[in-house]
Amino acid sequence: MEANKTTEGPQDTQDAKEQPSLEDTNAEDLYEATTHETPLQPSSSQKHFQPPEIHLETPASLNPDTKGAEGLQDSSVSGTPPVKSSSSGLLSLPPQLSPQSVTSLEKAIAEIPLEEFGYDSPISKVKEEPLQLSPTANIPEYGSPISEVQKESLEVSPTANIPEYGSPISEVQKEPLEVSSTANIPKYESPVSEVQKEPLEVSPTASIPESSHELTSDKVPQTQVPESEHFPKHSFSESPTQAKEDESTKEGEAGEDELAVGTSKIPAAKPGLRAKKKKEKRAGGVTSRPVVPAKRAELVEMAKAVHREQFDDQVNNLFQWEKDSTLKAIQTGIYIGWRCPHYLWDCFRIGDESKCFCGHLLREHQIISDLSVPCSVSQCRCLMFCFIPSRPEEVGEFWLKKRATFDPKAWRAQCRCKHTHEEHAATGAHPCRHRGCFCPSFESNFLCVACDRRWEEHETFFETGDTRRKGKRPYGANNIKNWHRTY
């Protein structure tokens, strides 16, 4: 045995020379792994050790697995069986280390967790969520290990088929409903335990495959319905037969209303119209209706608005001057009128109470001829009578007399320069005589109530019966009959 030990000495020395290098590399690898992966806080027993001596010597002396692995590696390299070297004493613990510290160090090293990176980890859970499909969308086919999809042939019809889902969780009731075009979407207020399937109205081009899926979740897939489509509004307690009966009763009531009127579907006449027709009918077939002017009904309303007791007096006062002037013209044979030159009828007939532009009445003028009617008032330069309205009714301002502070005698016709006709010159173009006013001629701020033309467009005419007959204007007795005729 001693010979064997002596003969094996050189090899052991070589192995011992090579072994420290391997041990050093293994120890460095372990040190790097422990320092990078999980940093440890040294215990109280470990503080007495020197770091290089601990990490280099303890793995070789404490771990028998590393020794066996190194022996196998040496034997494979040298081709000789592993031999226990005599230089193991060099790797022995120093005398100052106690066995308790060694055991605590072993426990600390053994408790170091090493993180293993698993790249081939299987996917734990795959969430299955229903897809919202449009009627014209193409559904791709996927082969998944979770559920088996049964492929069935598609039957395209004007009313699309509805997918039937076989669910192990909830039982689905199949109930065919006839949905009308004016249906409303049902409202569900209770938790859904049993889902009723209702047919959807889909366009003829849409086709949905029928397939059965084993659902892992409690959710039931829903399809999006266009907003234009509405479904009947009913609760779960109501059956589809009740909805049909309600629709049939509504249609029956509508049909009875139409039959009551007649087959022509004409709405029934109102009772008020029938009562009016009965009043109009009398014995003998004679009908009577109130006579109301259709085109000028506002005249009747205006006449009703006027006080009935004073209506005759107001009308007589308004047209009394016309009557007096007409009768006097027939007696004297001189017809005095105020009109536009091309008119065949006079806008106003001039009488003794008519006022001239100079501010004096017609009776204060002297009629010499049809072209010379001067004023007889002293210091008046008027050479020809020129009619101007002296009452507000003659210019269409009827409402002025209703004012409490209105004085009819103080009313005067005004120019557009806001001065009266008496403040203008009586001859020529009638310029304004007011101090500081540069109005060259009188321009009325009113219109004629008979023809809606301005005062300066009218003229005053003195004519005989022969002149009016030649001009085809009314004269004599015709003057009384035609004085109210329009132009």
Swiss-Prot record:
Residues 227-236, 243-253 have a biased composition (Basic and acidic residues). InterPro entries: Fam221a/b (IPR026755). Coiled coil: none annotated. The keyword RNA-binding does not apply. Keywords: Phosphoprotein. The keyword Transmembrane helix does not apply. The modification Phosphoserine is found at residue 248. Residues 1-13, 36-48 have a biased composition (Polar residues). Residues 81-103 have a biased composition (Low complexity). This is Protein FAM221B. Belongs to the FAM221 family. Residues 1-103, 132-289 are annotated as: Disordered.
